[in-house]
């Protein structure tokens, strides 16, 4: 089932097309990576999903229903631009935001206690936001985003301000949220996070969706038939129909001249050496990103 369906959505600001007939589907219980260079249209799309602005054309469905104001209660949004009130105490801030999302006061207090204890934040409750470091404030905003257990969570650059330890903590919390049934849209320039977390991705450039699918499908579509081999013995000569990209004792990387020859590599190798391991090298999402944008 799709939690979110964006169908041919367009948005213009004056003469500039921020989005041009964009269509994507976000499946329930998965992490969806929304990728693109600066100015590609990602922020405009996120604002439309949050009903901060409206599309000029197109339609949005939420769990199969036409997207309405009531659905905002089922969305948690962590914006790239931080929005905490600096003079408020942290606990009061979280309580206020939780109640805005429809949680009764007592339930909100219980959930704040749960999350603050879980993330080792109990000592922050009576601090003012302005007393917090950037990373501490980011943790508070993350809790405020997920506290009402929204069906759809939108995280725009969620790792900004975090050291490696806290980045890992938040990454694990994102995985736990998915395992507990939440659907997550992750917008980030950290391609290693996309590799680790995302099931599906869409790549937006110049207001258009130029790539859309599962991470595995996209990697398969962009693969260049490159193989890494570890072996024992001595390679006696060139491998027919393959270019040797790199080679050292007991290790080599080969690229097929054409995909029709890929099945012949292992056969040629075992005639010369004892093969220890044989792996096809798939492109990283960073490779896919750079190639796709460069080709536009």
Model-identified regions with their sequence ranges:
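ABC transporter nucleotide-binding domain
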Residues: 172-256
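Short, charged/small-residue-rich alpha-helical element at the C-terminal edge
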Residues: 224-296
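Catalytic Walker B motif of ABC-type/P-loop ATPase nucleotide-binding domains
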Residues: 153-157, 162
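Conserved ABC ATPase "signature" region
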Residues: 95, 99, 107-124
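Helix-to-loop junction immediately C-terminal to a conserved catalytic motif
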Residues: 50
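Conserved ABC ATPase signature
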Residues: 128-135
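Conserved ABC transporter NBD signature motif
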Residues: 57-73
